[in-house]
């Protein structure tokens, strides 16, 4: 999980920052999880990796703020996907956040309207 979630976020961020610094602007949005704030017993490695993504976001935000770059993350709860519906068939899907709802939050964070938001971990929990 650390390799997949945290290392991947780190390497992609490391790859895009030089161009953003050169252009004196940029938006980085990582995908974390609500479990990154409070671990859950059944998904320990996942929680740890997502906590790392949140700390990575905060650290990068501080490091690049003077270059006109914002770095934030979104923390979805359970996402309404086909795979999750199969895995949790007894759950109330009506309360889950949909992928397009997460996308709208990400689009906002990438907009000029969000230029004052930097280093934030935005919860996207729906009604769960």
Residues covered by each model-derived region:
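Catalytic Tyr-X3-Lys loop
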Residues: 1-10, 25, 29, 53
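Active-site loop immediately N-terminal to the catalytic Tyr-X3-Lys motif
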Residues: 38-44, 66
């Amino acid at each position: 999980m650390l390799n997949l979630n945290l290392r991947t976020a780190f390497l992609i961020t490391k790859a895009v920052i030089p161009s953003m610094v050169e252009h004196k602007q940029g938006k980085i949005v990582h995908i974390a999880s609500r479990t990154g704030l409070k671990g859950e017993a059944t998904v320990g490695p996942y929680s740890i990796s997502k906590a790392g993504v949140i700390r990575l976001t905060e650290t990068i935000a501080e490091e690049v703020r003077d270059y006109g770059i914002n770095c934030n993350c979104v923390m979805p709860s359970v996402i309404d996907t086909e795979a999750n519906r199969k895995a949790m068939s007894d759950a109330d899907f009506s309360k889950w956040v949909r992928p397009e709802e997460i996308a709208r939050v990400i689009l906002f964070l990438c907009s000029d309207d969000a230029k004052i938001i930097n280093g934030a971990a935005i919860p996207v929990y729906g009604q769960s």
